[in-house]
From Swiss-Prot:
Its EC number is 1.14.14.14. Its main location: membrane. It is found in: Membrane. This is Aromatase. The gene is CYP19A1. Heme binds at residue 436.
Amino acid sequence: MIPETLNPLNYFTSLVPDLMPVATVPIIILICFLFLIWNHEETSSIPGPGYCMGIGPLISHGRFLWMGVGNACNYYNKTYGEFVRVWISGEETFIISKSSSVFHVMKHWNYVSRFGSKLGLQCIGMYENGIIFNNNPAHWKEIRPFFTKALSGPGLVRMIAICVESTIVHLDKLEEVTTEVGNVNVLNLMRRIMLDTSNKLFLGVPLDESAIVLKIQNYFDAWQALLLKPDIFFKISWLCKKYEEAAKDLKGAMEILIEQKRQKLSTVEKLDEHMDFASQLIFAQNRGDLTAENVNQCVLEMMIAAPDTLSVTLFIMLILIADDPTVEEKMMREIETVMGDREVQSDDMPNLKIVENFIYESMRYQPVVDLIMRKALQDDVIDGYPVKKGTNIILNIGRMHKLEFFPKPNEFSLENFEKNVPSRYFQPFGFGPRGCVGKFIAMVMMKAILVTLLRRCRVQTMKGRGLNNIQKNNDLSMHPIERQPLLEMVFTQEAQTRIRVTKVDQH
């Protein structure tokens, strides 16, 4: 028999009780810690997908990258309700489409900051610069007065005549946006008109419309693509190269135009006649109030704003008119009553109620900008939900406009604006301290261009092709997918003062 002291099994069995507690304690602690985190996150009072030990944030951010911001917001609100918690880049993010909550965010200074990828915003020049996505509240406050002054007062009145003139001039040279088969690229036409009007009021130098419009489109694509990308994306140079080049291309073009403006200002005799938006910025730089980078980015953002959003909005309006000729008839009767045979003037604007309601209903039914992105600067409570400092906020105003108040929320109908609509239920431009600084001039521009166009155009639809047939991409904003036949129209002369606009199918 083997002595007990020499039996190797004795050593093995005696070691197991001593080693097991030491080996399992860290594992047990880790499991308990993860369980506590999981249990804490899962019991959040805010509806939304679960945290699931970090898997939830990865999935939600991935959904934004895959579906686009607008589509992802609609998905989460439809799935979980009108106040939803998700994550973007690991940061807690609330998606809100409830009017009372949206009103609270817009109203308070606590939400004047934006959010987005730092590296992405740096690439396009918007990080702590310009006005659109400047997430430095102190610097944004210094920049905003330049935009406010340019977009109000005398500039607001001048823009009406500029829009009328530009629309007429561009209708007289449709061949520049006409294809070989005679179809007109109406979206490109609207972009050219918007760029021309912006240039005449804010910059005032000669430019190549076709080239700049293309550069603006590429810049917007880069902005939309990079806004929420994770940092690792920017470490792979071949992935972001084309976006960096697109941003650099437009910024370089703007630098050249601004230098032309500087040269022009140095030779004029009376500065008062040339004190536009760009001039104010240049003189602010000369005083040391702004840097050259500030000036370049502010001019760039002023020049891209209308071609980026208002052009698509007007394009959609033409499609909606084509789908419902009775709407055109109502507007034409009002236009003839208010204006007669003359062109639209500033005094006419308050009297064009049907035209105004049509614009509002178009923006409600098919918004181009249907979300607003903000960041909480301090802890807060919104409709009973706690909001921590640094929380991202996305206001899904496009969905909000179809949930409350309107009698026919899912239809395009002028009846939705026959009665006065309380501001809390309809905010296409936002309001409050960070509301759209150009909302008043935007309405003036859309009215002036639409009225001038309708006085010369009749809009008809062929083969029942409507807005629902057009493929759209809903990311940072809603844009029709380019290069599809339904984006083209045929303009044929019908009478001396009117042109027929016919939407066609190339197939």
